[in-house]
């Protein structure tokens, strides 16, 4: 399929609820510095996206720090997805994963043989996902 994204994950083993916002920003920026130092973040490779415990705010901090570290990179803001609209984000990003699941399920139920193999009936009625 040659899809240009996917495959890498990174994390910090912290509980963000236990830190002040200013501390979280410092931690996130330092994490970005460490990723950059190891050439593990750029608009053309290892593009982070929000996940558990992160969102638009953290993605904006990462993008801003990456841009600060790479002032000549014209595509610096593209080093992460999931930024707020005001920082180059895309409308609908928050809903994108759920929408992808919706489309995948619709496509799955179009193929009766696959539905039969799965042991499901041809509808989502009364099912939990």
Q: Can you describe what each PLM-predicted range is?
A:
Residues 1-96, 100-104, 108-111:
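N-terminal ligand-binding/catalytic initiation module
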Residues 108-125:
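Inter-helical turn/loop segments and adjacent helix faces that build the functional surface
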